[in-house]
């Protein structure tokens, strides 16, 4: 694993962060957002797909790490809509021969800060420190994408090896026996 593409999926704004870890240290290559201008779902999905494909073609990552789908039971429609964003990202990755691994928000927070309930500010401080940034990463979608990419890197460094059979597109199966997982 040398280049990790972290993605925070969203229908209107999808954050991404590309890091190079080939030297054993983390180096930020690029971070940004793919903004959907379309008012229609099919247009939004197409714009996300095109934007992520462009990032993949530019940086040629070895893997895509994405935030795991989560929604409150009061808002099932949110999960369905977010599933569309995740689906087109998984398709873009698959068509480039890349595996996608997902991490829940609690797992990302715990790996980055040691606290699964860390605040956004604590996460941003951890990212700023690790990437040697002069300011906090903004907007929040970018910060989340960088946190996910860093989480995947630290996950591997902590000795948790991911078998190819556990890399299912959009499904978190890294800790199948971990009962603390969200």
PLM segments and residue spans:
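Phosphate- and other anionic-substrate recognition elements at nucleic-acid/protein interfaces
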Residues: 1-182
């Amino acid at each position: 694993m040398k280049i990790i593409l972290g993605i925070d999926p969203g229908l209107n704004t999808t954050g991404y962060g590309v890091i190079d870890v080939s030297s054993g240290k983390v180096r930020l290559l690029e971070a940004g957002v793919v903004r959907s201008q379309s008012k229609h779902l099919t247009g939004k999905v197409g714009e996300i797909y095109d934007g992520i494909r462009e990032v993949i073609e530019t940086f040629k990552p070895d893997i895509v790490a994405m935030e795991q789908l989560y929604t409150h039971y009061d808002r099932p429609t949110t999960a369905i809509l977010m599933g569309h964003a995740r689906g087109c990202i998984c398709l873009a990755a698959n068509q480039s021969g890349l595996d996608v691994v997902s991490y829940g928000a609690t797992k990302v927070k715990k790996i980055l800060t040691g606290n699964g309930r860390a605040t956004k500010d604590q996460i941003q401080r951890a990212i700023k420190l690790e990437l040697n940034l002069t300011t906090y990463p903004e907007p929040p979608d970018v910060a989340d994408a960088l946190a996910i990419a860093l989480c995947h890197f630290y996950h591997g460094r902590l000795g948790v090896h991911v078998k190819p059979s556990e890399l299912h597109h959009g499904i978190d199966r890294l800790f199948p026996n971990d009962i603390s997982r969200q």
